[in-house]
Amino acid sequence: FVMEFDATEIANLIKTKQLSPKEAVMTAFSEIKTKNGQLNAVVSLREEKALEEAKRCVDLARPFAGVPILLKSLGQYLEGEPATDGSKLFKDAKATQTDNFVKALQQAGFIIIGQSNAPEFGFTNVTDSKLYGPARNPWNPEFYSGGSSGGAASAVASKMVPLAAASDGGGSIRIPASFTGLIGLKPTRGRTPVGPSSWRGWQGASVSFAITRSIRDTASLLAAVQTVQPPAPFQTPLLSFNLEDQLPKNRKVAFSLNSPVQTKVSEAAKQAVLSAVNFLEEQGFEIEETEPKLDGTQLIKDYYLVNDVESAVMFSNIENALERKLKIDDMELISWCICQAGMDVKATDYSRMLANWDQAAFVMDAFLEKYSFFLTPTTAQTAPEVSHQFINESMRAKMRRISELSSRERTDLVYEFFMPSLAATPFTQQANLMGNPAISLPVHVASNGLPLGVQFVAKKGREDLLLKMGKLFEQNGKFRII
């Protein structure tokens, strides 16, 4: 029954000696062993070490002292633990140092019990690596739980753990939260610790945080891990707020049902937003259907260009470490194509792309001067089936020949093969490239019995607005969490 509670309640039980850290950790291990066979959410455990750390957990003043947590098996390194990044290339790799974000979790009192499933290098919006296999959805295991923090979402939605560490470089916290009926906050760029393994993940698009079941957990965790980190390339001032303060009703909310890349949006996704709009109007908010004037298609092409180039650098570093050239069989086909596409991008094109990001951030900031919130569906549809293939065989054949193409043809091919999966999740990426905070709230269940979230975006540094908006929905019984 312990894992029915959120992390705040488990921490309170530990503080008041009604539960020991060891009991909390043992309960989480028991839940994982019972449920993981069906869901494939967790890919490694550190039982002996976690139980030893739980026994030594005596400083109960820390906000999450003794609470068990999973790290994501991608870019959240703990010294001595697996460092696979979801890739067969690194199936035996171990982390040689601990990341600052992981240290922040430990300093908040969490006991790290293992790692959650993630797709290879986090490139996809479902979790389906050849190394680990698919992470399945607790609402219906025939469906995906999303990606790239799919294992984290499966583990939290199935109550293996009260919350799980995650990261978001294009929606990888918010997409799984939408697909599994959870809360997914992507903080402002520079809000949470980075390094030393990576300092500017995808030029600052990627940020670490967590997938959660309660707004109070989300707020307390943000307060616990936020930082101003002098060596980091991006900083944002520390946030101080009281979650009990009401959200002023004179805040304007803009909403849109349109895909930024002109793809189809399901009726379920539209209904999720319109229901939220009705609720907000009842609460006295001023609502307007409008959107920032942005070229969504160009922005997503710019987003993929960063993925291409940053990945090419990563693979070049891997080649140097391995002292050999990487081959197509070393990795999954998507990873190979992204790597190949990034090899020959001109520096002028890359610089122009970053300027486009900055201009988009300027446009969004001006838009959020007038409207405190921008509301959209989080995802354009509910979770896809595990049997669904986003990339068909003829496209795969084309991808296998990517090295024969010109530089422009390669980047065009990346956009082309990602389009079917992008169409399912086109709403999340812009907040990453602009640096804004965004939250997915679990407010809707579609007629197929699967959940779907709505997304609120706010000005940089204003996670407090997003959390108070989340609390408004939560305390009025609008959340649909299993």
Please state what every model-predicted region is:
Residues 1-44, 49, 482:
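An N-terminal boundary/leader segment
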Residues 64-85, 252, 309-365, 381, ...:
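Short helix-loop capping/hinge segments that flank enzyme active sites or metal/cofactor-binding pockets
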Residues 99, 103-225, 437-441, 451-453:
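Short glycine/serine-rich loop segments
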Residues 50-52, 57-130:
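Acidic/His- and Gly-rich active-site-bordering loop/insert found
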Residues 412-438:
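Alpha-helix-centered segments that form part of catalytic cores
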Residues 186-271, 480-482:
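A short helix-breaking turn/cap at a secondary-structure junction
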Residues 233-306, 331-334, 338:
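Gly/Ser-rich, acidic/histidine-flanked active-site/gating loops
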